[in-house]
C-alpha cells in the first residue's frame, strides 16, 4: 500500500474576506423591492381595470336608460 505525502504548510489556509458582501445584500434588497413594486403596480392596474369596467357598465346602463326614454317619449 502506498502513501501520499503532502508538503507541510507554514500557514493555515484562509479564505479571502468577502468584500462584495454588502454590495450583494444591497442588490438582493433592490431586487426584492423591485419585485414588490412590480406586484404593487400590477395590483393597481388590476384595480384600475376593474374600476374602468364598472364605470363602463354604469355608462352603458345610463345610455340604455336614455335611449329608452328617447324611444318612449
Curated annotation (Swiss-Prot):
Region (Disordered): 1-48
Superkingdom in the source lineage: Viruses
Compositional bias segments (type: Basic and acidic residues): 16-27
Pfam families per the UniProt record, alphabetical: Tombus_movement (PF05318)
Keywords: Transport, Viral movement protein
GO cellular component: host cell wall
Polar residues compositional bias, start-end: 1-12
UniProt entry tagged with the keyword Transport: yes
GO BP annotation list: transport of virus in host, cell to cell
InterPro entries reported in the protein's UniProt record: Tombusvirus_movement (IPR007982)
Subcellular compartments: Host cell wall
Function summary: Cell-to-cell movement.
Protein family: Belongs to the carmovirus/necrovirus/panicovirus movement protein p8 family.
Name this polypeptide is given: Probable movement protein p8
Originating species: Panicum mosaic virus (strain United States/Kansas 109S) (PMV)
Amino acid at each position: 500500500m502506498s502513501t501520499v505525502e503532502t508538503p507541510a504548510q507554514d500557514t493555515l489556509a484562509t479564505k479571502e474576506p468577502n468584500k462584495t458582501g454588502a454590495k450583494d445584500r444591497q442588490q438582493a434588497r433592490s431586487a426584492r423591492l423591485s419585485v414588490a413594486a412590480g406586484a404593487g403596480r400590477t395590483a393597481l392596474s388590476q384595480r384600475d381595470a376593474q374600476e374602468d369596467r364598472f364605470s363602463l357598465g354604469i355608462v352603458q346602463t345610463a345610455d340604455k336608460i336614455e335611449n329608452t326614454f328617447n324611444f318612449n317619449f
